[in-house]
Regions:
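Thiol/disulfide oxidoreductase modules built on the thioredoxin-like
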Residues: 57-113
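Non-globular targeting/processing and membrane-anchoring segments
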Residues: 112-121
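Structural microenvironment flanking redox-active thiols in thiol-disulfide oxidoreductases
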Residues: 1-61
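Detector for Asparagine
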Residues: 14-15, 28-37, 66, 75, ...
């Protein structure tokens, strides 16, 4: 749901500088970068995935951005497990500097925060 909301907001703003970066919390399933990027671009054309090469790298990335996640076994499901995670949007400038964390993910707030951020760049 978050990707859909962010993608809609970015399309509405239509700022050429806007780029969506998705950090996968499940490198075992999201192990094909090309397929994951194709899926992401359904939500926003200028989107790319970051997929950690191993659990240690993933832990480093999630610690840096204070992302909480947990693998939950689903014994009665064909999927086998699910990943529960915090739901945040991080605004990062072109130089990779952290700008702001957005935890209120209602559509109006996302749109407002993205406009403020993109206009400040």
């Amino acid at each position: 749901a978050t990707l859909s909301l962010v993608g809609k907001a970015l399309k509405q703003i239509n700022n050429p500088k806007a780029h969506l970066l998705f950090i996968s919390l499940d490198p075992n399933r999201d192990n094909n970068l090309s397929n994951t990027n194709e899926w992401l671009r359904y939500f926003y054309p200028k989107a790319d995935a970051l997929i950690a090469k191993d659990e240690k790298t993933l832990q480093k990335i999630t610690k840096q951005y204070n992302v909480q996640y947990q693998k939950i076994d689903l014994n009665d499901s064909f999927m086998g497990y699910s990943i529960a995670h915090s739901n945040m949007l991080y605004l990062i400038d072109e130089k990779g500097h952290f700008y702001k964390e957005i935890s209120d993910l209602n559509p109006q707030e996302i749109l407002r925060e993205l406009r403020i951020f993109l206009n400040s760049q």
